[in-house]
Curated annotation (Swiss-Prot):
HAMAP family: Urease_gamma. This is Urease subunit gamma. Keywords: Cytoplasm, Hydrolase. It catalyses: urea + 2 H2O + H(+) = hydrogencarbonate + 2 NH4(+). GO terms for cellular component: cytoplasm. It comes from Roseobacter denitrificans (strain ATCC 33942 / OCh 114). Heterotrimer of UreA (gamma), UreB (beta) and UreC (alpha) subunits. Three heterotrimers associate to form the active enzyme. InterPro entries: Urease_gamma, Urease_gamma/gamma-beta_su, Urease_gamma_sf, Urease_subunit. Coiled coil: none annotated. GO terms for biological process: urea catabolic process. Transmembrane segments: none annotated. GO terms for molecular function: nickel cation binding; urease activity.
Protein backbone atom coordinates (compact mmCIF):
# COMPACT_ATOMS: atom_id res chain seq x y z
CA UNK A 1 0.00 0.00 0.00
CA UNK A 2 1.40 3.37 -1.03
CA UNK A 3 0.38 6.25 1.21
CA UNK A 4 1.17 9.92 0.79
CA UNK A 5 2.74 11.78 3.72
CA UNK A 6 -0.63 13.44 4.41
CA UNK A 7 -2.38 10.04 4.47
CA UNK A 8 0.28 8.71 6.86
CA UNK A 9 -0.28 11.70 9.16
CA UNK A 10 -4.04 11.11 9.16
CA UNK A 11 -3.54 7.43 9.96
CA UNK A 12 -1.13 8.21 12.81
CA UNK A 13 -3.54 10.75 14.33
CA UNK A 14 -6.42 8.30 14.02
CA UNK A 15 -4.42 5.59 15.79
CA UNK A 16 -3.31 7.97 18.55
CA UNK A 17 -6.93 9.05 19.04
CA UNK A 18 -7.99 5.41 19.34
CA UNK A 19 -5.35 4.85 22.05
CA UNK A 20 -6.63 7.97 23.84
CA UNK A 21 -10.23 6.68 23.70
CA UNK A 22 -9.17 3.36 25.23
CA UNK A 23 -7.28 5.15 28.00
CA UNK A 24 -10.27 7.37 28.77
CA UNK A 25 -12.48 4.27 28.93
CA UNK A 26 -10.09 2.84 31.55
CA UNK A 27 -10.20 6.09 33.52
CA UNK A 28 -6.65 7.17 32.61
CA UNK A 29 -6.14 10.91 32.22
CA UNK A 30 -4.84 12.11 28.86
CA UNK A 31 -1.44 13.68 28.25
CA UNK A 32 -0.75 16.47 25.74
CA UNK A 33 -0.30 14.35 22.55
CA UNK A 34 -3.33 12.19 23.36
CA UNK A 35 -5.55 15.23 23.93
CA UNK A 36 -4.41 16.84 20.67
CA UNK A 37 -4.97 13.58 18.76
CA UNK A 38 -8.49 13.12 20.13
CA UNK A 39 -9.55 16.69 19.31
CA UNK A 40 -7.95 16.52 15.85
CA UNK A 41 -9.60 13.20 15.04
CA UNK A 42 -13.02 14.52 16.05
CA UNK A 43 -12.63 17.53 13.75
CA UNK A 44 -11.37 15.45 10.80
CA UNK A 45 -14.18 12.90 11.14
CA UNK A 46 -16.85 15.58 11.57
CA UNK A 47 -15.64 17.32 8.42
CA UNK A 48 -15.72 14.02 6.56
CA UNK A 49 -19.33 13.56 7.71
CA UNK A 50 -20.24 16.87 6.06
CA UNK A 51 -20.49 19.17 9.07
CA UNK A 52 -19.59 22.86 8.64
CA UNK A 53 -16.35 24.60 9.63
CA UNK A 54 -18.16 26.68 12.27
CA UNK A 55 -19.80 23.55 13.66
CA UNK A 56 -16.43 21.78 13.91
CA UNK A 57 -14.84 24.78 15.64
CA UNK A 58 -17.48 24.50 18.35
CA UNK A 59 -17.62 20.69 18.46
CA UNK A 60 -13.83 20.45 18.76
CA UNK A 61 -14.04 22.33 22.06
CA UNK A 62 -16.48 19.78 23.49
CA UNK A 63 -14.49 16.59 22.88
CA UNK A 64 -12.73 16.41 26.25
CA UNK A 65 -12.94 18.20 29.58
CA UNK A 66 -10.29 19.44 32.02
CA UNK A 67 -11.09 16.52 34.34
CA UNK A 68 -10.10 14.04 31.62
CA UNK A 69 -6.58 15.49 31.25
CA UNK A 70 -3.43 15.32 33.31
CA UNK A 71 -2.63 18.38 35.40
CA UNK A 72 -1.33 21.28 33.30
CA UNK A 73 -2.40 19.88 29.92
CA UNK A 74 -5.38 22.23 29.37
CA UNK A 75 -3.13 25.24 30.01
CA UNK A 76 -0.64 24.04 27.38
CA UNK A 77 -3.23 23.83 24.60
CA UNK A 78 -4.46 27.27 23.55
CA UNK A 79 -5.47 26.43 19.97
CA UNK A 80 -5.66 23.32 17.81
CA UNK A 81 -5.43 23.85 14.05
CA UNK A 82 -6.50 21.06 11.73
CA UNK A 83 -6.59 20.84 7.94
CA UNK A 84 -9.77 18.86 7.36
CA UNK A 85 -11.40 17.67 4.16
CA UNK A 86 -14.96 18.96 3.82
CA UNK A 87 -17.34 18.09 0.95
CA UNK A 88 -16.36 21.36 -0.75
CA UNK A 89 -12.60 21.06 -0.22
CA UNK A 90 -9.84 21.18 2.39
CA UNK A 91 -10.11 23.93 4.99
CA UNK A 92 -8.22 24.99 8.09
CA UNK A 93 -10.24 24.63 11.28
CA UNK A 94 -9.00 26.42 14.41
CA UNK A 95 -10.41 25.31 17.75
CA UNK A 96 -9.76 28.00 20.38
CA UNK A 97 -9.37 26.88 24.01
CA UNK A 98 -10.34 23.30 23.14
CA UNK A 99 -10.25 21.93 26.69
CA UNK A 100 -12.80 23.64 28.94
Amino acid sequence: MQLTPREKDKLLISMAAEVARKRLARGVKLNHPEAIALITDAVVEGARDGRSVADMMEAGAQVITRDQCMEGVPEMIHDVQVEATFPDGTKLVTVHNPIR
